[in-house]
Amino acid sequence: MSMLAERRRKQKWTVDPRNTAWSNDDSKFGQKMLEKMGWSKGKGLGAQEQGATEHIKVKVKNNHLGLGATNNNEDNWIAHQDDFNQLLAALNTCHGQETADSSDKKEKKSFSLEEKSKISKNRVHYMKFTKGKDLSSRSETDLDCIFGKRRNKKLAQDGCSNSSADEVNTSLTTTTTTTSAFTIQEYFAKRMAQLKNKPQASAPGSDLSETPVERKKGKKKNKEAADTDVENSPQHKAKRHKKKKRVEAERGPVAKKRDRAELQPGGPSEDECSDASVEAAEDCVQTPDIQDDVPKPKKRKAKKKLQRPEGVEIDATLDRAPVKKKKKKVSR
């Protein structure tokens, strides 16, 4: 019975804890086979019968330690590690590692995959497979490009400096010197003769000077043709017709005032009245809707001709009816 202060432990009791029923059984399959081969009870296993004569004892393992480990050997792990390191060192010395010379020899003994495929019995020699996979004939730069390796910048700079030095040396060595048999006077005489034989370059200059003038004339002609086309267009004619109607509608009271002023003594002359009527008509015409289309001076003459016969007709009617005199407002 355990003490009250101790930890409670579960214990399992079996009928045969030492497994004596199995050890005392002589009809086991393994024992029969060993007896057929010359073994008997009390002898050890092995060729010289030096093995254990008793059965292996079973021990209950209730911890996380390795097989065969006990609490007494917990502090000996450093010694175990040292023994393991010594064992590895002994194995390395016995078998021996490969030296650097052997690795260099292996690198030199490179084989061609293409030749190996030709020799093989299975005949797997196809050009598109073997030649593309055979890297023995490739240079270091090609392999670096394939596998994506980058070289140091120092090596690239050294290569550039060496190439530039070689170019300078080649340029110095490949310079050629020519000696002419002509004298200085003969050389210049030859050059002057060549210059005289060349065609004069003044003609193309005159052509170039004439071309801008011709271009300007062509532009003016194109503009005039475009203006005539616009004037002859039906839209432009309709606009002019509307303008004339507006001018006549707005010019009616202005013409009446002018005729009345002519009948008054000391009134303005016909030319002054016509000029005033034209100016008033122009003021009326220049409305905000039609500010862009300003009438040309040629149309003023036509307007004067149209205004004069109307004035004559109005004078004939005014002779018959009495006219009231009105003062004219002067705009300042």
Curated annotation (Swiss-Prot):
Region (Disordered): 1-27, 196-332
Alphabetical UniProt keywords: Centromere, Chromosome, Kinetochore, Nucleus, Phosphoprotein, Telomere, Tumor suppressor
Motif extent (TBM): 291-301
GO biological process per UniProt: mitotic metaphase chromosome alignment; negative regulation of G2/M transition of mitotic cell cycle; negative regulation of protein ubiquitination; negative regulation of telomere maintenance via telomerase; positive regulation of protein localization to nucleolus; protein localization to chromosome, telomeric region; protein localization to nucleolus; regulation of protein stability
Keyword Nucleus: yes
Limits of the G-patch domain: 26-72
Entries under SMART domains matching the protein: G_patch
Residues annotated with Phosphoserine modification: S233, S269, S274, S277
Chief location: nucleus
Gene Ontology MF terms in the entry: protein-containing complex binding; telomerase inhibitor activity; telomerase RNA binding
Basic and acidic residues bias locations: 307-322
Classification via Pfam families: G-patch (PF01585)
Compositionally biased region (Basic residues): 236-246, 297-306, 323-332
Key word Nucleus present: yes
Compartment(s) where it occurs, according to its Swiss-Prot or TrEMBL record: Nucleus; Nucleus, Nucleolus; Chromosome, Telomere; Chromosome, Centromere, Kinetochore
Cellular component terms per the entry's GO annotation: chromosome, telomeric region; kinetochore; mitochondrion; nuclear chromosome; nucleolus; nucleoplasm; spindle
Ranges in coiled-coil conformation: none
Domain text: The TID (telomerase inhibiting domain) domain is sufficient to bind TERT and inhibits its activity.
Subunit relationships: Interacts with MCRS1, TERT, TERF1, NCL/nucleolin, and the telomerase RNA.
Protein name: PIN2/TERF1-interacting telomerase inhibitor 1
Species this chain originates from: Mus musculus (Mouse)
